[in-house]
Amino acid sequence: MELITNVSEYEQLAKQKLPKMIYDYYASGAEDQWTLKENREAFSRILFRPRILIDVSRINMATNVLGFNISMPIMIAPSAMQKMAHPEGELATARAASAAGTIMTLSSWSTSSVEEVNSAAPGIRFFQLYVYKDRNIVRQLVRRAELAGFKAIALTVDTPRLGRREADIKNRFNLPPHLVLKNFEALDLGKMDKTNDSGLASYVASQVDRSLSWTDVKWLQTITSLPILVKGVMTAEDTRLAVESGAAGIIVSNHGARQLDYVPATISCLEEVVREAKGRLPVFLDGGVRRGTDVFKALALGASGVFIGRPVLFSLAVDGEAGVRKVLQMLRDELELTMALSGCTSLAEITRNHVITDSDRIRRSRL
C-alpha cells in the first residue's frame, strides 16, 4: 500500500474497500450535502497569524477534559455500527484511543456492547445516548455504562427525527444480517426492519423520542451522577439553555452534516457558542476536522478540544486498529507542528489572535 501521508487519504482507500451501502452510510450527508462540504471548506477560510522567534523546542499538548487528563485535545466522536467497517469495530477503536491516551465516545448504536468495549482496553470513555420513548431503556443503558466504567454521557439532542440521507434511501440501508446493535440485543431492539427506504430512519421513527426537551436533560441528571455533555448545540440561545439545564459541557455539532442541511459549519458556529458560554462550561467541536491545523483553529476560537468521526471509520476500514492509531498520531503530529510554527508551546498559549476569520476580514474592511 502506498504511504499514507494525511488523514483524508484514508477515505478514498475506504471507498475502494467497503461495500457501496456501507461506504455511503458513513460518508454521506443530508439532502444536497451542502453542509457536508461546508464543514470542511469553512476551515479553509480561517487563516493564521503566526508569531516568530519563540522557543518551541518543547511543546506540551496535554489537556484536561471534565477532570480527566488526556494526551492531546483530539478525541473520538461516537460513530455507529463500526463492525460494518472492520470485524473488530469499536474494540479496535477503543484500543487505539487507549494507546493514544485520549477519550473514545461509544455510540449507543454500536456493534460492540459497553461491557465488551470496557474489556477491550483501559482508558477514559464517554457514552453517547439517544433518549428512547421507553425511558426504562434509557435507565438500563445509563446504568450499564456506569457499571462499565464510562465517565460521561454525551446526549445527542439534534435527532428528534433522522435527517433525509438520500444515499441510504437509494441503497435501502440496513444493518448487515450478521451484525446487531449490541447494547439492545437483550431488549430485542438490536435489529432493524427491512423497509423500502432506510432501515435506520424507520428504527429512529419507531424508537427515539421526538418529545425530547430541556426538561429531559434535567431528568437525566436524576438517574445518573455522570457529567452530561449536550451534543448538537449551534446557537447562543441553546447554549444559554444548556448552562441553565446543568450540562457539564457542550459539543458544537451538526451531526456530521447528516441531519438538517444548510446549517452552518460547526467551526462557523463555535465563537457564538463560546461567547455565550462565558467560561461556565467547556465547549467542544466536531465536524470537518481533517488536519492538525483544523484542531489549532478550533482551539484558537475557544474550543476546549475536538472530536473526530469519519477519519476513524475510514482508517478502521482500511487498516483496523493500526489505521485508527495512525490517524490519531498524524493529527497529533500536525497539531504539534502547527503550534511550533505559530509560536505556541502549550494549548494555553493558543489565542484568538492566532487566527483571522471571515468576520475579522469584514470588520477590517469597514474601518
From Swiss-Prot:
Catalyses which reaction?
Answer: glycolate + O2 = glyoxylate + H2O2
Q: A GO term (biological process) for this protein?
A: regulation of photosynthesis
Report the GO terms under cellular component. peroxisome
The UniProt annotation places FMN binding at: 78-80, 107, 128-130, 156, 231, 253, 286-290, 309-310
> Which compartment or compartments is the protein found in?
Peroxisome
- What CDD domains has UniProt attached to this entry? alpha_hydroxyacid_oxid_FMN (cd02809)
Please report a single Pfam family linked to this protein: FMN_dh
Cofactors (names): FMN
Location (main, coarse) = other
Q: Where is the active site?
A: H255
Molecular function GO labels: (S)-2-hydroxy-acid oxidase activity; FMN binding
Please indicate which residues carry the site annotation Involved in determining the substrate specificity of glycolate oxidase: W109
Asked if the keyword Cell membrane belongs to this entry, the reply reads: no
Cofactor stoichiometry and binding? Binds 1 FMN per subunit.
- What is this enzyme's EC? 1.1.3.15
The free-text function statement in the UniProt record for this protein reads: Catalyzes the oxidation of glycolate to glyoxylate, with a reduction of O2 to H2O2. Is a key enzyme in photorespiration in green plants.
Which PANTHER family did the record assign? GLYCOLATE OXIDASE 3 (PTHR10578:SF70), S -2-HYDROXY-ACID OXIDASE-RELATED (PTHR10578)
**Protein name per its UniProtKB record:** Glycolate oxidase 3
Organism for this UniProt entry: Oryza sativa subsp. japonica
- What is the phylogenetic placement of the source species in the record? Eukaryota, Viridiplantae, Streptophyta, Embryophyta, Tracheophyta
